[in-house]
Amino acid sequence: EFRQIYPWMTKLHMSHETDGKRSRTSYTRYQTLELEKEFHFNRYLTRRRRIEIANNLCLNERQIKIWFQNRRMKWKKDTKVKSKDSM
């Protein structure tokens, strides 16, 4: 059994990965495919479109928003690499 020797070892001070952090979202292949298709046509979404996609894919708006932010960063990085390779 774990003994608390110092006051800072109380639950308040002990950090757990699950406390305060959200777990990583795993997208199904179907969700990923639909998100990629949408990204192909629009890199930025209106709020209305984000709500539609969230409802269709059973995700929340925040997940859609963050997926698109991450995908834009990946796209930006990939285009930089391609332009360096062509020089």
Curated annotation (Swiss-Prot):
Organism: Xenopus laevis
Keyword set includes Iron-sulfur: no
Main location as per UniProt: nucleus
Similarity field: Belongs to the Antp homeobox family.
Compartments reported by the entry: Nucleus
Assigned keywords, A-Z: Developmental protein, DNA-binding, Homeobox, Nucleus, Transcription, Transcription regulation
GO cellular component: nucleus
GO annotation (BP), single: anterior/posterior pattern specification
Chain span(s) of sequence motif Antp-type hexapeptide: 5-10
PANTHER family for this protein: HOMEOBOX PROTEIN HOX, HOMEOBOX PROTEIN HOX-C5
A Gene Ontology molecular function term of the record: DNA-binding transcription factor activity, RNA polymerase II-specific
Gene3D superfamilies, per the entry: Homeodomain-like
Protein known as: Homeobox protein Hox-C5
SUPFAM superfamilies: Homeodomain-like
Stored SMART domains: HOX
DNA-binding interval(s): 20-79
